[in-house]
């Protein structure tokens, strides 16, 4: 039976709408983790498809400066994986939450314990950017009988056969990495990016979402045209931290019609 995240995103796709997933850093709020529910409900009210929630880590190799600094602010607020899990148990939302974490915090907590503790929460997906596909067996057995999907990341340098290998049996969505580099580095897209995304979209049987560097209205239009939707991180994190208006951008993204 398909996992909840797969079903919800497939329903949005079937309705002819673009999927929009904002990223937020857990604990990057003046109230620390006590402000997480407020941020989630703010985004839920704007109609987002799902919400990616980052766990702060001191060595975030895939993150650009905006998200790295957000992680440091969160850690300064005392955020820990244990505290985040306890907070997530208290949050009620109809929007699927997708946890983005490096493997180290997960390993320190214990993968089995992490999955068990989140079983009755809104968490429906897990992204581990520094976990190679060959080591997915460190995590997958613990997710097999749960409603949490392990989300594969597919980079621009991935050939077609490797793409098929990475996405075989995947649930939730495929995270298509739009740039070779860290998050938030916009505008430096390869000339063959659209071709790469179209090819990935053709071989995938679950939604393909484009992330890393997506930050403008033009990006929304471009990537919704060649994939099923977008993930936006740095732009959202920066706006929330600085109190900048972000509602109109999110509303435009949510309202995108294929």
UniProtKB/Swiss-Prot annotation:
The keyword Amino-acid biosynthesis applies. It is an enzyme of class 4 (lyase). GO terms for molecular function: tryptophan synthase activity. Its EC number is 4.2.1.20. It comes from the Bacteria. Pathway: Amino-acid biosynthesis; L-tryptophan biosynthesis; L-tryptophan from chorismate: step 5/5. GO terms for cellular component: cytosol. InterPro entries: Aldolase_TIM, RibuloseP-bd_barrel, Trp_synthase_alpha_AS, Trp_synthase_suA. The active site is at 52 (proton acceptor), 63 (proton acceptor). Keywords: Amino-acid biosynthesis, Aromatic amino acid biosynthesis, Lyase, Tryptophan biosynthesis. The keyword Lyase applies. It catalyses: (1S,2R)-1-C-(indol-3-yl)glycerol 3-phosphate + L-serine = D-glyceraldehyde 3-phosphate + L-tryptophan + H2O. Tetramer of two alpha and two beta chains. Belongs to the TrpA family. The alpha subunit is responsible for the aldol cleavage of indoleglycerol phosphate to indole and glyceraldehyde 3-phosphate. PANTHER family: TRYPTOPHAN SYNTHASE ALPHA CHAIN, CHLOROPLASTIC (PTHR43406:SF1), TRYPTOPHAN SYNTHASE, ALPHA CHAIN (PTHR43406). This is Tryptophan synthase alpha chain. The lineage of its organism: Bacteria, Bacillati, Bacillota, Bacilli, Lactobacillales.
